[in-house]
Design a protein with these regions (language model features):
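Active-site recognition of the HExxH zinc-binding catalytic motif
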Residues: 78-90
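Metalloprotease/metallohydrolase-associated module, dominated by Zn2+-dependent proteases
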Residues: 2-71, 91-136
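Short, small/polar residue-rich loop motifs at catalytic or cofactor-binding pockets
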Residues: 74
Length: 136
């Protein structure tokens, strides 16, 4: 059976994070960083907090509560933007809208080279995404 779109998205992000790691942040730093992003994006700031989760779950975006639960007390910037993307997107899956928004956020709040590399990982995995030039 072929991997699902979600599995391919996660695999692409994992491969990207191995090649171009993003910073790990304390919970206080994560909350401050996402507050800055939320202000720039014109949305309320989500609360980031540590929570017990299964070993195969790194984090969860809880849309109704507008918060992000993380398993580890030092999440990466990519993990935080992944979950922030879930909060910002209308579709709560890992489809084209999600990947396009994630690359846009990485571009604006981490770096252009990181965004280009993540975009390439998605394309190399045959995942659809809006053209990179329109993500910036």
């Amino acid at each position: 059976m072929a991997p699902s779109e979600t599995q391919l998205t996660y695999a692409s992000e994992d491969a990207f994070e191995l090649e171009m790691p993003t910073r790990t942040l304390s919970l206080d730093e994560a909350n401050d960083w996402l507050a800055m992003i939320a202000e720039a994006e014109g949305v309320d700031s989500p609360l980031v907090f540590k929570s017990s989760m299964s070993n195969n779950t790194e984090a969860l975006a809880l849309s109704k509560e507008w918060c992000i639960a993380v398993r580890k007390s030092k999440p990466t910037q990519l993990l935080l933007l992944h979950e922030m993307t879930h909060l910002l997107c209308v579709n709560k899956n890992h489809g084209t809208e999600f990947r396009t928004e994630l690359v846009r956020l990485v571009r604006h709040y981490i770096s252009f080279p990181h965004a280009a590399a993540l975009h390439k990982k998605f394309i190399d995995s045959k995942l659809t995404i809006t053209l990179f030039a329109t993500c910036i």
